[in-house]
Amino acid sequence: MESGPAVCCQDPRAELVDRVAAINVAHLEEADEGPEPARNGVDPPPRARAASVIPGSASRPTPVRPSLSARKFSLQERPAGSCLGAQVGPYSTGPASHISPRSWRRPTIESHRVAISDTEDCVQLNQYKLQSEIGKGAYGVVRLAYNESEDRHYAMKVLSKKKLLKQYGFPRRPPPRGSQATQGGPAKQLLPLERVYQEIAILKKLDHVNVVKLIEVLDDPAEDNLYLVFDLLRKGPVMEVPCDKPFPEEQARLYLRDIILGLEYLHCQKIVHRDIKPSNLLLGDDGHVKIADFGVSNQFEGNDAQLSSTAGTPAFMAPEAISDSGQSFSGKALDVWATGVTLYCFVYGKCPFIDDYILTLHRKIKNEAVVFPEEPEVSEDLKDLILRMLDKNPETRIGVSDIKLHPWVTKHGEEPLPSEEEHCSVVEVTEEEVKNSVRLIPSWTTVILVKSMLRKRSFGNPFEPQARREERSMSAPGSLLMKEGCGEGCKSPELPGVQEDEAAS
């Protein structure tokens, strides 16, 4: 990539704040959206025990996801709060017999120049041709981006920096007053822009087969636009809830192994996800699950995050997160609870606690026992694991390290998972990397880009079906929508104005 012109000696962060403050964002009317497309599906094929995966061997077979009829969006999937849904970062899985071989992966690119042109064929941003819109959100939109030189598609998030700064942090909200990053002391207070840079610097260096990869970050200081390029996972979420045709127990076991390894990697990097659920788990071409959507994630110091704010999706929230005690609670334990709810969804197609009213749902989560339906019939080992993951007491709830050793996960020791040392390496960022996490470079003065892309809409994973996206304040991933007749070089239709969903408190 070519180098941009020299930037003046002024502090680039202060310069960006000044530039962003000068940007006036007009509110446009919400564009009409079409109905949700039908989703085809059949029962997932029965899984035989996977053979060892070695370089050059066949990838794990991918079951077909279940069909879903049009439905009203429920508390089982609607997130609480309006935060940036940024599926980001990196990836490992399986036992010794189920681990995807690590392949060489290029580092995240830092662009020195953002060049945008509106040609007869399409809107082009550097080497990317922007095509159909595949997602919307509170901070911008997601568009399908085609890199002609690589003959490859990506998901490009176009964000409003002004809205990011207003929210005091990317990709999450600031910690509430009185919250502590560690048990021993208060969290380090960062300026909004410093938090943006620090978290992008970390996300750019995450590298794991069970976390979606951030490819490139582009910045245009003269405009209110920040561009994040991610791997495009066309298969979308592993499941949508509720679901009439859940997974066979063996398939659920393999997917849980992926999730646990990805979660262990994030916790090793001192990140708690806070919104683990089936729609935030994307299916890769290799058949493995990748964690996405870090919209309400938190970084922490010390051994665990001590949280006091509510975030995530109502039906996946842990009892301690919705308690009125006012006490802080463990971030890692929250992720385990949500993973337990997800595992329940995998085998039963619904959440263990369901209600149309949020207060009643909270009461059920805090007070009612987990009930296992008679059908489908599952093993006692699986029930035991679910009950231990859905322990209402976070102090006695099973941890990630013990889940990896559970008999159901390992088939009684026949298929052990790799140790933390084998698949996790701590990501550390220097002050220089934080400073350079996003290049502040001037764009071409003749550029026109789509401010209507940035107007007011809840924005999360780029795989969210259009109809469901209307009903939520923070999107979770759904099937990838690619408009018919839009080829690699086609002209993107005029971008509709988008409205920002109000945050649910």
UniProtKB/Swiss-Prot annotation:
Residues 128-409 form the Protein kinase domain. Residues 438-463 are annotated as: Calmodulin-binding. One of its GO terms (cellular component) is cytosol. Its EC number is 2.7.11.17. Calcium/calmodulin-dependent protein kinase that belongs to a proposed calcium-triggered signaling cascade involved in a number of cellular processes. Phosphorylates CAMK1, CAMK1D, CAMK1G and CAMK4. Involved in regulating cell apoptosis. Promotes cell survival by phosphorylating AKT1/PKB that inhibits pro-apoptotic BAD/Bcl2-antagonist of cell death. Belongs to the protein kinase superfamily. Ser/Thr protein kinase family. This is Calcium/calmodulin-dependent protein kinase kinase 1. It comes from Mus musculus (Mouse).
